[in-house]
């Protein structure tokens, strides 16, 4: 592990700032962007890129969760159960996923995100109610953690991308509150994963630390922006982000070949 030059240091902090704003706005850690940037821009292997991105994601998620919960208190019992199920699912699915074709998994996940994004975009562009209705009993909400944790276990990213639309569409949660609950279930998964990667010496702290500093400087602004925007606008932005992410995941193997 070598120390970055001054130019690299400012570049990393700028990247972290952009990812912090992005993560705060959408209630995610930003790893789905950070991993390919670190792999392509800094020549890191996949495992090192994922571990290093986690060192940035964890503080962003913690601060983001705190900021979100101050504006919209999280239903603690559901959030705790969801986080526990997400952590357990992440661990067991990760053990199982090591023998699976990662390319096929990525394609399936990307297709799923694309369908979610298009559906959210279609619903938010039509007749829209500021008071979403639930089509599934709230007692099942903790099991969203299984789907978010499954995504984290299979691909190391995407827990919040899966959980948030499920919370808005199935359980009638407002977008900002759904992102808050999503952060609550993803954060413990990211912490466990960071300790695991660090134990395997797969975290470059000289890169992760300036990324985290930059992210911490802007995540609060992202959270404030998420709460300032109208509900329909936030759902439209989130659906667009899902579509762009899905398309990127589909072309990623060809770009990073």
Segments predicted by a language model, with ranges:
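Hydrophobic alpha-helical transmembrane segments of multi-pass integral membrane proteins
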Residues: 115, 180-193
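Short hydrophobic/aromatic, small-residue-rich stretches within specific transmembrane helices
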Residues: 53-57, 182, 186, 207-212
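Juxtamembrane transmembrane-helix boundary motif
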Residues: 1-21, 33-35, 40-41, 46, ...
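Transmembrane helix boundary and interhelical junction motifs in multipass membrane proteins
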Residues: 25-34, 156-166
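Transmembrane alpha-helices of multi-pass small-molecule transport proteins
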Residues: 52-67
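Small-residue hotspots at the loop-to-helix junctions and early N-terminal turns
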Residues: 46-50, 179-183
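Proline-centered helix-kink/hinge sites
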Residues: 35-36, 59, 164-165, 188, ...
């Amino acid at each position: 592990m070598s120390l970055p030059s001054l130019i690299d240091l400012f570049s990393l902090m700028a990247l972290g700032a952009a990812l912090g704003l992005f993560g705060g706005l959408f209630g995610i850690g930003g790893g789905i962007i950070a991993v390919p940037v670190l792999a392509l821009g800094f020549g890191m292997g996949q495992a090192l890129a994922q571990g290093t991105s986690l060192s940035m994601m964890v503080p962003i998620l913690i601060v983001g969760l705190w900021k979100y919960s101050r504006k919209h208190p999280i239903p603690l019992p559901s959030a705790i159960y969801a986080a526990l199920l997400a952590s357990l699912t992440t661990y067991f699915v990760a053990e199982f996923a090591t023998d699976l074709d990662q390319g096929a998994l990525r394609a399936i996940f990307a297709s799923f995100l694309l369908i979610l994004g298009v559906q959210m975009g279609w619903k938010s562009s039509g007749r829209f109610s500021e008071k979403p209705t639930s089509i599934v009993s709230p007692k099942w909400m903790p099991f969203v953690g299984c789907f978010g944790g499954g995504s984290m276990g299979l691909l190391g990213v995407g827990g919040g991308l899966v959980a948030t639309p499920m919370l808005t569409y199935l359980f009638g949660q407002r977008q900002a509150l759904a992102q808050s609950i999503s952060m609550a279930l993803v954060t413990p998964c990211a912490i466990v994963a960071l300790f695991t990667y660090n134990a395997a010496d797969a975290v470059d702290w000289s890169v992760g630390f300036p990324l985290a500093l930059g992210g911490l400087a802007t995540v609060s602004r992202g959270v404030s922006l998420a709460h300032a925007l109208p509900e329909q606008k936030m759902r439209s932005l989130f659906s667009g982000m899902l579509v762009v992410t899905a398309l990127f995941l589909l072309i990623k193997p060809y770009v990073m070949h």
